[in-house]
């Protein structure tokens, strides 16, 4: 089971936030995450693994402040220790930065690059945020592998279409260039012929 929430800010469209029911489900989320996903977890404490799905073309720097705090509060609220504390640090990083090795416990992860891990602090629990998110909560039993494959297939098709469009434009540009070269060649030829005609005419006048 995966829990889905909706978050939005004043200046952006809605974002999807999701988290697994337990550490075993977290394994599937780690395995089948998307490049657009940002992972959240309470720093140095046990907590839920919360993911924010960015819009295509966005990166971690583009997360609206309101959406960032929604994710941080949701993580804090789903930490047995963290939910009782103030000034809780929450770490977040792109899904692609998560490192999972065979010797790690279920639900445990590391990072490929520590420099790509960011921290946001939740000073205290804000019920208004949690209540708002709770109203958007939806429980689903998704086929994460199938959804990931569908996403990847769409991306491959988009890239294929972009390559085809690029080739079409290149072909069109080559055609235009060839036509311009032919036109310049024809114009140059006509100019030479005109000059020859004028010279012939002048010679004829001189002999009259």
Swiss-Prot record:
<dbReference type="GO" id="GO:0012505">
    <property type="term" value="C:endomembrane system"/>
</dbReference>
<dbReference type="GO" id="GO:2000147">
    <property type="term" value="P:positive regulation of cell motility"/>
</dbReference>
<protein>
    <recommendedName>
        <fullName>Coiled-coil domain-containing protein 25</fullName>
    </recommendedName>
</protein>
<keyword id="KW-1003">Cell membrane</keyword>
<dbReference type="Pfam" id="PF05670">
    <property type="entry name" value="NFACT-R_1"/>
</dbReference>
<keyword id="KW-0007">Acetylation</keyword>
<comment type="function">
    <text>Transmembrane receptor that senses neutrophil extracellular traps (NETs) and triggers the ILK-PARVB pathway to enhance cell motility. NETs are mainly composed of DNA fibers and are released by neutrophils to bind pathogens during inflammation. Formation of NETs is also associated with cancer metastasis, NET-DNA acting as a chemotactic factor to attract cancer cells. Specifically binds NETs on its extracellular region, in particular the 8-OHdG-enriched DNA present in NETs, and recruits ILK, initiating the ILK-PARVB cascade to induce cytoskeleton rearrangement and directional migration of cells.</text>
</comment>
<feature type="modified residue" description="N6-acetyllysine">
    <location>
        <position position="23"/>
    </location>
</feature>
<dbReference type="GO" id="GO:0003677">
    <property type="term" value="F:DNA binding"/>
</dbReference>
<feature type="compositionally biased region" description="Basic and acidic residues">
    <location>
        <begin position="147"/>
        <end position="184"/>
    </location>
</feature>
<keyword id="KW-0472">Membrane</keyword>
<keyword id="KW-0238">DNA-binding</keyword>
<feature type="transmembrane region" description="Helical">
    <location>
        <begin position="67"/>
        <end position="83"/>
    </location>
</feature>
<feature type="topological domain" description="Cytoplasmic">
    <location>
        <begin position="84"/>
        <end position="208"/>
    </location>
</feature>
<keyword id="KW-0597">Phosphoprotein</keyword>
<feature type="topological domain" description="Extracellular">
    <location>
        <begin position="1"/>
        <end position="66"/>
    </location>
</feature>
<dbReference type="InterPro" id="IPR039730">
    <property type="entry name" value="Jlp2/Ccd25"/>
</dbReference>
<keyword id="KW-0175">Coiled coil</keyword>
<feature type="region of interest" description="DNA-binding">
    <location>
        <begin position="21"/>
        <end position="25"/>
    </location>
</feature>
<dbReference type="GO" id="GO:0005886">
    <property type="term" value="C:plasma membrane"/>
</dbReference>
<comment type="subunit">
    <text>Interacts (via cytoplasmic region) with ILK.</text>
</comment>
<keyword id="KW-1133">Transmembrane helix</keyword>
<keyword id="KW-0812">Transmembrane</keyword>
<feature type="modified residue" description="Phosphoserine">
    <location>
        <position position="204"/>
    </location>
</feature>
<dbReference type="InterPro" id="IPR008532">
    <property type="entry name" value="NFACT_RNA-bd"/>
</dbReference>
<comment type="similarity">
    <text>Belongs to the CCDC25 family.</text>
</comment>
<feature type="coiled-coil region">
    <location>
        <begin position="117"/>
        <end position="187"/>
    </location>
</feature>
<feature type="region of interest" description="Disordered">
    <location>
        <begin position="147"/>
        <end position="208"/>
    </location>
</feature>
């Amino acid at each position: 089971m995966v829990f889905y929430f909706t978050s939005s800010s004043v200046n952006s469209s809605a974002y999807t936030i999701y988290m697994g029911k337990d550490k075993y489900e977290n394994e599937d989320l780690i395995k089948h995450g998307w490049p657009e996903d940002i992972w959240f977890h309470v720093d140095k404490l046990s907590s839920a693994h919360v993911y924010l799905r960015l819009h295509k073309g966005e990166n971690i720097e583009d997360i609206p402040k309101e959406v960032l705090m929604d994710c941080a509060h949701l993580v804090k609220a789903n930490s047995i220790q963290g939910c009782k504390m103030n000034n809780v640090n929450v770490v977040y990083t792109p899904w692609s930065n998560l490192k999972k090795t065979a010797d790690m416990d279920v639900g445990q992860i590391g990072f490929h690059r520590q420099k790509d891990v960011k921290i946001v602090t939740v000073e205290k629990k804000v019920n208004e945020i949690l209540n708002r998110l709770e109203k958007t909560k939806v429980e689903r039993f998704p086929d994460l592998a199938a959804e990931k494959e569908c996403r990847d297939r769409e991306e491959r098709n988009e890239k294929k279409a972009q390559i085809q469009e690029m080739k079409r434009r290149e072909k069109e540009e080559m055609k235009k260039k060839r036509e311009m070269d032919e036109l310049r060649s024809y114009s140059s030829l006509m100019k030479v012929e005109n000059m020859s005609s004028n010279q012939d005419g002048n010679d004829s006048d001189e002999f009259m």
